[in-house]
Amino acid sequence: MTDESIIIALINNCLNYLIDNSINDPVDILRYLQKNIVTGRELEMSSIETPTDGDTNFISVDRHELIETAFDEVGALTDLRPTLEVQFYGENAVDSGGPRKEFFRLILREIKEKYFEPIRPFAKMEDYETIGKILALSMLQNGKIPQFLDFSLVNELFESSSPSLVVLNLRKGLDSLARTLQGTHYLQKENIILRIVICVRSLLIGSSLPQFRHLFNTKQPVMTLKGAITMLKPKFSEPGSNKRSLETRVYSVFTKYLREVSSGRRENISLHSILMFATGADEEPILGFAVGPEICFSESETYNSFLPTSNTCIHRLTLPIPSAEKDLPTNEILFHLYDLAFANTYYGLS
């Protein structure tokens, strides 16, 4: 069986299942496609014990030259189905989900600014093909949805029989997950499916399920104080224990800090910054977190260790608590340490 035959069979199986089971919700469609398309290592860790074996597409990129290095690395990938594994130059994090989400967040922001504000029809067309690959990967691998695309551009991407050169090359990139298998005989079934797209064209149902397109134009709500407190669930010790008392004391200070951030009184820090520090993402992915973000507590032994730390692969924010040797600093000092941590954009903060 050829690679092309395998892809065609995969598309047919997904199509039949979606149609036969009347799955119309865009999020449910995306979840089903992710399950059946992405291969290799698990996209997310469900616990610290989750094995990290399995095939990946490994890329190494520079935060300071992200467009150039990412386009080189992603452009060289031939099979886009395996889980993407990202390493930033000079940083020591092992990617089990966190660095990948961080990569998608950063690269989509730069793509938006450089290529879509406004669209640059005279840019290198191969750039738009690589952009299409990145958009498809981001959607299928728990990254951000590309919600910066103009509504008319989304319609052209799905439906136009005479697209612009920019859209034509975006299609090529988006279609690369399915070897550009579009418009062939398997796309006919009771006139229900007019266009099958992988991510946005070769597998996801676009023309006959226009509600799917709203994923591209629906803006994520701004995170609120209530939303942040609800999302970052504290993991306390047993009630009545000395440790629980210390944890509650620190958590109370942290919620005060969240109020300061929410009110705009901590310069350059937002609630999104804190979520990003804990998870690698500045908003909840469209398919949700495999493991909900949580706050854990660890005993502090030195002054510097009152800095928060995180494990973005399991979405864990750790807040130090006082020990017998070291009492809790003042709120002013703690808030300053929290600022230092949450303003950090590099993996490997010590």
Regions found by a protein language model. Name each.
Residues 3-141, 145-151, 267, 350:
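Hydrophobic, conserved cores of late-appearing folded domains
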Residues 45-58, 62-71, 80-82, 154-350:
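C-terminal catalytic/scaffold cores in eukaryotic proteins
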